[in-house]
Amino acid sequence: APPGNDGVSPQEARWRLSQLLGPNAEARPQQADYASAVSQAFQPREAEDSPNLVLAEAGTGVGKTLGYVAPASVWAQKNQGPVWLSTFTRNLQHQIDTELDRLFPEMRDKQRKVVVRKGRENYLCLLNYEEAVRGLQVRSQDALAVGLMARWTARTRDGDMVGGDFPGWLPDLVGRGRTLGLTDRRGECIYAACPHYRKCFIEGSIRRARRAEIVVANHALVMIQAALGGGDEGTIPPRTVFDEGHHVFDAADSAFSAHLSGRETVELRRWLLGAEGGSRSSSRIRGLKRRVEDLLGDDPEVPEALDETLRAARCLPADGWHGRLTEDAAAGPAERFLASVRQQVYARVTRPGDPYSLETELRPAIQPLVDGAAELDTALEALYRPMKRLHDGLHARLDAEAEDLDSDTRRRIEATCRSLNRRGLMQVGAWRNMLQAAQDAAGPDAFVDWLMVERADGRDIDVGLHRHWVDPTQPFAQFVAQPSQGMVITSATLTDGSGDR
């Protein structure tokens, strides 16, 4: 059931704050005033797309954390819904989690009512761990690392390996490959097809977040969830508090940007086609066909759309693309476009020998780049169309066979549709918009586009076309603020001091 709409009065916020502080706490009127002011964000919304928004600046030492936890916890308990507390840094995320011990002194209650949410790449993947155990037959030297990981896995609160209860000294002792290398890597998750799905740390945190009272997250995750219409959660948090609010727009700038680069396009090809050419990559990078072939149903158009998608995906760069670019031997539309990007960057920068990344403006574009953009746009259209048919065909099966599908199959189809939309349709659509703009003498006013050759230690590692919003508050307002019922943006430094006298 959706959460209720009961508001939180200033008096309730002050009362809860006094409970959290205890009878022997030092009186801090500013903290009580802050909690009272923040409670306005927890009133019922009065108009569509008009959240109750509170901008609250309070200096260091006021006690902001408990100041907003007080009304947030009252709202969550009264309305049976979660409040998301978002931070920019892991340190503050950990601090909030610690402060919540005051609200839930019993660890059993806290584990049920408080969830710390981070991106997938922060959590141990149990299937990766299983593969590491199997690998001991040929790599017995990994036994110590795998054994220590087993002890930690049995006792960890939530499987968080980056800033959670994972011992930071362990990778230095036994190596990263069998420790931090076991996290969920981008694009590998097979969701309900995984034998560990029901015990998965990531899926567990997502499920618990739906039932929790307080979800402690970070700005990047909240932004991406909003941009994806709820993402893995499937819903937009009804109430959100952004602490470290002066970083909100940096986070929005990053979350709502687009990158058409060698690294991004290679990842999409690998996600669609799997490991190619005898790659020694993880056996789980097995391509879209092997992941979904048992989900296609009886409609003959769906397997046909899958085959067309996989054929069209070969327009994307394959392994070894970077060497071919430097040797002027680009193969395929994407590589030819990236080669033209590299050519323009090196032609325009004044110090191409610098060890740092190189950037230049997109316009005026050289003719090979304009031609390459047109060619790649055509190739991506041929990829987008069958991918859309595949997505729609799978989604239609959810409705057509609603009464017959078992829960695991339904979850796998839903996860596949989300992945196709997020990793495929949205990404390819953004790339096509960028390529079409690259062919025009004047780009769209809302965006800034530029070309970059990314370097590490003086060596080129990536090439691409990048797009950011000129004003990232526009997508923030549309995708994050408008769907919300109430929002707090707070920091010690929200204003720039320009009005001071």
Regions flagged by a language model, labelled:
Residues 39-43, 65-79, 100-103:
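Walker A/P-loop NTP-binding motif
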Residues 211-224:
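Conserved two-lobed SF2 helicase motor
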Residues 1-18, 49, 60, 79-213, ...:
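A substrate-engagement module of RecA-like helicase motors
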Residues 3-56:
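Conserved pre-motif I regulatory segment
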